[in-house]
Each structure stands twice: as structure tokens, then as C-alpha cells.
Swiss-Prot record:
UniProt keywords, alphabetically: Ribonucleoprotein, Ribosomal protein
PROSITE patterns membership: RIBOSOMAL_L36 (PS00828)
GO MF annotation: an example: structural constituent of ribosome
Family recorded in the similarity comment: Belongs to the bacterial ribosomal protein bL36 family.
Key word tRNA-binding present: no
Entry keyword Ribonucleoprotein: yes
Protein name: Large ribosomal subunit protein bL36
Record GO biological process: translation
GO cellular component terms attached to this protein's record: cytoplasm; ribonucleoprotein complex; ribosome
Length: 37
């Protein structure tokens, strides 16, 4: 899980979602998981 100021899709399978007011990227590739913080 990467925590960064700007989250971007790293591949075409990445999905940008909002959870509890946080922007997150979920992806089958665990390296692409990100959270805005």
C-alpha cells in the first residue's frame, strides 16, 4: 500500500474508489494499491 498525495491509475486494471472519504486505488496487482493521505 502506497500512501501519496496524488493517486493515479498505474495500469488499465486499476480502479479508483472512495472509501470513508479517502481516495484509493485497488488493482489485481498488489504493487498498485494506493491510498491518498
Amino acid at each position: 500500500m502506497k500512501v501519496r498525495a496524488s493517486v493515479k491509475k498505474m495500469c488499465e486494471k486499476c480502479r479508483v474508489i472512495r472509501r470513508h472519504g479517502r481516495v484509493m486505488v485497488i488493482c489485481p496487482n498488489p504493487k498498485h494499491k494506493q491510498r491518498q493521505g
